[in-house]
Amino acid sequence: MLDVVALLLIALAVGFWFVRTRYSYWTRRGIGSEPARFPVGNMEGFRKNKHFIDIVTPIYEKFKGNGAPFAGFFMMLRPVVLVTDLELAKQILIQDFANFEDRGMYHNERDDPLTGHLFRIDGPKWRPLRQKMSPTFTSAKMKYMFPTVCEVGEELTQVCGELADNAMCGILEIGDLMARYTSDVIGRCAFGVECNGLRNPEAEFAIMGRRAFSERRHCKLVDGFIESFPEVARFLRMRQIHQDITDFYVGIVRETVKQREEQGIVRSDFMNLLIEMKQRGELTIEEMAAQAFIFFAAGFDTSASTLGFALYELAKQPALQAKLREEIDQALRLHNGEFTYDSMQELRYMELVIAETLRKYPILPQLTRISRHLYAAKGDRHFYIEPGQMLLIPVYGIHHDPALYPEPHKFIPERFLADQLAQRPTAAWLPFGDGPRNCIGMRFGKMQTTIGLVSLLRNFHFSVCPRTDPKIEFLKSNILLCPANGIYLKVQQLSQMSS
């Protein structure tokens, strides 16, 4: 009995020593950091009463400009580099990219196939896969998909009008409507299927899309473990995505492939590219589903939230809304009343509005990278980064830094005029990342967002109402930025306002 007690005491002492030593890592190196608590490190309250930005942004604000190019924090027991210097961020993403190719995110192609997509995979797989998928996102392919997205935009206009006519005082929850629009767009462009989400909120494709982002397979502590120690989680064959969601997307891809191959259907879309890769033996059905899923994931929640945030800000500032609407109307007049791919390129103020929306609400509010080798930050050996160490670039904190964007809480599209852009470092705006691993679907996302805004603003006026939150609160359980309480706006048809 005494031997057992002695062993337990020794184990506790060793554990205490290990935790204390681990949590003194940054202090021993002379790097600024906040005190950590076992077992969550600096992640206390994460996904409960704090969003990730609520944890990271104060650390960025406290330690930026203190002489070191980064601060330290802990994801559970894992010490993570928090980049506070924009020149270092640029070096990580662009100049020294070869050392920071990997994102260090959880992926498990064997047991959790939908996680094996381009955004998550690391090592030798990601570069050839990106090169093969890049042709889908060229300007020529965007021009080809433009009419399809516009068709969904027209349906969005019809559905929005019907909902506004039937709603009490014309008040609509915009976020869900935007999600149904983006799910229909991506269903057609990525999966080659008609989703009918706009007409039917209970359409399976739209429901599965919402579930893929909102439902957690595990409790917060287990999720935190998977995200903090992805290699260990992969070794333990842990999974993040519910099986029925995986089965749904794999099933859609399998059925689409079978139909196209049997009927000889060839389209210039994303699914056709995946089929060609499968026929060359480069992808399995499960791997195809993972790539189609990330097309969906990257365009569904991100573009839907961006549309909602943009309409929210335009509703709060009617003068900006009127200015953007006038630009849209002028572009239509110059093109005989038609909205074309060329006329979309002429919407300069639209570009400013979208850029400022993504500045204030970067949907992915942080970027992660892994250092492959020992690295001296900015050439200073004192500020070294160890091999295998995770780095985090706090996009939200950078975008809300008053030294870069005075009065960052205000929505000012003119921040992105050429003369103001020239005054800021290139790493001051990172909604799509930067460098060789920037967002591959950036063009598609911008096009989808632009068409959505054009479809709505040429037909409707948006204004705040008693249910509009004065400030958007973010859903704490989501690593992305999305509204916790929806976005309620009053929607009026322009034709009825002028009559």
Swiss-Prot record:
Keyword Oxidoreductase: yes
Native organism taxonomy: Eukaryota, Metazoa, Ecdysozoa, Arthropoda, Hexapoda
Gene Ontology CC: endoplasmic reticulum membrane
Cofactor dependence: heme
Major location (coarse): endoplasmic reticulum
Membership in a protein family: Belongs to the cytochrome P450 family.
Gene Ontology molecular function, alphabetical: heme binding; iron ion binding; monooxygenase activity; oxidoreductase activity, acting on paired donors, with incorporation or reduction of molecular oxygen
Binding site for heme: 439
Record's keyword terms, sorted: Endoplasmic reticulum, Heme, Iron, Membrane, Metal-binding, Microsome, Monooxygenase, Oxidoreductase
Name the UniProt record assigns to this protein: Cytochrome P450 6a22
